[in-house]
């Protein structure tokens, strides 16, 4: 067998781990406590900041400690429309306004939310990327469950006690602007992780990649591989259910007409 390929090296970590040195901190919802379960807490957005390596901006929110004379600083993923000086309310009795945090079971069907909890009290795991959002579809009061549509389009049933922030994650449309030059791509990925530039497998030598080698750049074999393929060979279309063009869409009408002719 050839050398240890890039995919095997990535699995080990080392130089491929995320660059977190200049990050501002982990943004998450308040820890679930008695005040949020039975009432609400009022916070103030002090600052909207940029977090290197993240597309969405962060909001620095100050809360009064409900149990002692103290101010607690919290990092939230900013929702679109949040501003400095805004009052943010977290809890069961909070109103349905952009930036507020409340249980999804109390939101009307069709509400757009972000930073959604997957398990009650985990402080936000779903719909956190810039421009992303989840939507509340339906409630089941008997089982205390709520059906939610995730950014991927998948529908998931979650406990109604799970909290979420009302609104869409800020920074939408970020990927619409083209990168245009290599310097911007270099700086973009330098602050994220070591994954750029990415050399194609067909451009390598046969000892470095299963797709490498040959008098011209071609894979030379089927690019689909089994799920149980050993590391070093497991590259390409892994356990693909199907390959090729997806037929039946709007773009295939002209293609069908040409075939008939």
From Swiss-Prot:
For whether the record's keyword set contains RNA-binding, the answer is yes
Q: What is its main location?
A: cytoplasm
Q: Give the record's keywords alphabetically.
A: Cytoplasm, Ribonucleoprotein, Ribosomal protein, RNA-binding, rRNA-binding
Compartment(s) where it occurs, according to its Swiss-Prot or TrEMBL record: Cytoplasm
Q: Which GO terms describe its molecular function?
A: rRNA binding; structural constituent of ribosome
The answer to keyword Cytoplasm applying to this record is: yes
Gene Ontology CC: one annotated term: cytosolic large ribosomal subunit
Start and end residues of each stretch annotated as Disordered: 207-233
* GO BP, sorted A to Z: cytoplasmic translation
Q: Which family does it belong to?
A: Belongs to the universal ribosomal protein uL2 family.
Q: What name does the UniProt record give this protein?
A: Large ribosomal subunit protein uL2
Species lineage: Eukaryota, Metazoa, Ecdysozoa, Arthropoda, Hexapoda
| Gene of this entry | RpL8
């Amino acid at each position: 067998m050839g050398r240890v390929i890039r995919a095997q090296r990535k699995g080990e970590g080392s130089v491929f781990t995320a660059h977190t040195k200049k990050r501002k901190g982990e943004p998450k919802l308040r820890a679930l406590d008695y005040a949020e379960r039975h009432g609400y807490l009022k916070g103030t957005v002090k600052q909207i900041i940029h977090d290197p390596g993240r597309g969405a901006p962060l909001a620095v929110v100050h809360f009064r400690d409900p149990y002692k004379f103290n101010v607690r600083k919290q990092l939230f993923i900013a929702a679109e429309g949040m501003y400095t000086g805004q009052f943010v309310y977290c809890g069961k009795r909070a109103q349905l306004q952009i930036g507020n945090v409340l249980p999804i079971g109390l939101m009307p069907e069709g509400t757009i939310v972000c930073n959604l909890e997957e398990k009650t009290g985990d402080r936000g795991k779903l719909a956190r990327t810039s421009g992303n959002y989840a939507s509340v579809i339906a409630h089941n009061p008997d089982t205390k469950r709520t059906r939610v549509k995730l950014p991927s389009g998948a529908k998931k049933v979650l406990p109604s006690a799970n909290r979420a922030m009302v609104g869409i994650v800020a920074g939408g449309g970020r990927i619409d602007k083209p990168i245009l030059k290599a310097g911007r791509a270099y700086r973009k990925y330098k602050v994220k992780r070591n994954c750029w530039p990415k050399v194609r497998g067909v451009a390598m030598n046969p000892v470095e990649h299963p797709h490498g080698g040959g008098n011209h750049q071609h894979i030379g074999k089927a690019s689909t591989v089994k799920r149980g393929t050993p590391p070093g060979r497991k590259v390409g279309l892994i356990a693909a259910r199907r390959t090729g063009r997806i037929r039946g869409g709007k773009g295939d009408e002209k293609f069908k007409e040409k075939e008939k002719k």
